[in-house]
Each structure stands twice: as structure tokens, then as C-alpha cells.
Amino acid sequence: ALFQKICSKENLKKHVESGTSFNTATGWMEVQKRIRKSNNWERMIKILSYAAAVLVPVFFVGISLKYTTHDYFSNKSVLIAQPILPGAAKAILTLDNGETINLNKETADALQTIEGTNIQIDSTTLNYQLAQSTSVSPKPVYNKVEIPRGGEYALVLSDGTKVHLNSMSSLRFPVAFTTGKREVELQGEAYFEVSKTGQPFIVNANGMQVEVLGTTFNISAYPDEEYQTTLVNGSVKVSAEKGESLILKPSQQATIALGSNSIQVRTVDTSFYTSWVKGKINFKDQRLEDIMKTLSRWYDMNVVYENEKLKNIRFGCNLNRYEEITPFVKLLEKTEEVHVKIEGNTITFHN
């Protein structure tokens, strides 16, 4: 019984995962206690022989496991050929005439003037500045900024409104706002800091419409996910495509489920939903599939599930948005609920 207890799979795993080899002194003390309880010399000889058989091999097995196998248990089935790196600032600007410009370091400091608006491009931000000395055409001229997988980019509109676009997102907007309202079209996710000009600012996002005067909010409107508007400060009006409309207060979030025209409102910690703008990615009790949708857009990677049930396992974690994905993978492995294999830019989950 003593041998089985010491060498059981659970006991060895316990010592190996804690980074320690088997404690021979503790094992010997346990043997001695049993010896003292027995007055039978033959039984003592038998126990001593068991002890010798147990302690000597286990001592060396423990040392061997500590220095040669501990990494295996720590990483279990993690296979990483090369690290999957985080995204970076990159985008494509499409002008009204169809011309496209890659927004990266090579196009930094490029300066153009379109319909009386100066466009300043640097490595992370696209800045539209209305040239006061130039007349603006009454007909709106539109530009579009598209963010690929593994990208993000910041944008300052001609009215001073700041927009931070997330991966796989796009914003279509007028170079200069010429009518009584400011209106843009969003797909994906963006964080808005709307300047106060007295004119309504309207965001059309896949059937959801958000109207404000001057405020800070986050919109997530990816085509395969529910639509969310999270209000940081100010006031916004949220409207479903063919349904109700309502006014949000600060710290409230409006959600429209896919295929629905009803709006659900709840109070939230807004920093949780806007942390991506500040270099963090937070998850709280979320399905693995939903977590990986977010991460795959940012890390530009493919995700495979060998067992469909793994998609519904729930996790929570806080990540540095600008680190490679390895720390996250190790966190998943420690739960022992899922194992991970990484090959190229594909991450595979299995039992």
C-alpha cells in the first residue's frame, strides 16, 4: 500500500508539477512510523525491504522527473513551432476616386489635399484637417479606411472626432462634413471620441444606428457577432434597423442579437469593453470560441477545434494586447480542460 501511495500517478504528478523531486526524508519517516508500530521482526524486515525498493528508485526517478520531465508537464501538449505575434498599426485608405494607399511606415508624413481638406498620414494615425482658406464642395467626398486582420489604426476626422479602429474593421466617412449632420458607416469595432460641434454625429453599423452630439463610446458590430454599443460618457441614442430606439446613460451597454430588432440594456464596467484601446484584452467567463474570434482577428491566425464541445468551455483572463500569444496558451494549458497545438499561424484545440 505504501509503494502504491508513493508511486501513484497522482502523487508523482503532484510533485513533478510543483517542481520538486520526491522528499526521501519524509518517505523514510513514514516507513519508520510503521516499523515502530510493529513488534513483529519479520514484518519489520519485510517493510525495510519494501522501503529500500521504494526509496532508492523513487529518489532517482524524482530527480530525473524534476530536471527532464517537468517541462513536459508544465507545457503538456503545447507544440509551438514559432511564436504567433500580435497585430500592429496598418490600414488601407481608399480615396473617392478608387485609389488606395497603404497606411504604414513607408507612407508616413505623406500630405495630400482633397476637397479643401489636408490629410496627414503617419505610422499610426490618419488626420484630416479642414483647410479654412479653401472652399469645400457641397457634395460630400467619401474616403474609407479598412483594417485587415492583425491590424489597428487611429483616425481624426475633419471635425476633430477621434476614432480608433480595431482589426477587421472599416469606416466610411466624408472628407469634410458639409450637411447639417455628421454621418459615418462602420463595420467591425471602433472607439469614438466625438467632438462637440452642435451637429448630430451618426454611426450606421450593420443595421444599428447610434446618434450623439459629443461623447465617448465603443461600438462592436462584426457581422457574425451580436452588436454592442458601450457608453463611456455623454449620451447616445441607439436604434435597431427595424425596431425600437432608446437613450443610453454613461456605463450602459446596448446589445442587439443577430437577427433581432430588440435592444437589451445593462449596466457594465466600460473599461472592460474599451481596454483594447489601451493595450489590454480582457475576458470574463466567456466561451472559448468567442475568445478566439477576438484573438484570431488581432493575431491574424486560424483556429481549429478537434472537438466541438471545447468551444463552450468558459475562461477568463487579462492579456497584454502587444505580447505574442504564448502566455495565453500556457494559461489555457494550466486549466487542464483543453490542450493546444500551434503550427504556423494555426492554433488547434484538442482534449
Place the predicted regions along the sequence by residue.
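Prokaryotic Sec-type signal peptides and long signal-anchor helices
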Residues: C7, G19-F22, T26, I63-S64, ...
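Extended, solvent-exposed functional surface patches
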Residues: V56-V58
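Short helix/strand-capping connector loops at secondary-structure junctions
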Residues: S8-V16, K309-G316
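N-terminal amphipathic alpha-helical interaction or autoinhibitory segments
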Residues: A1-S8
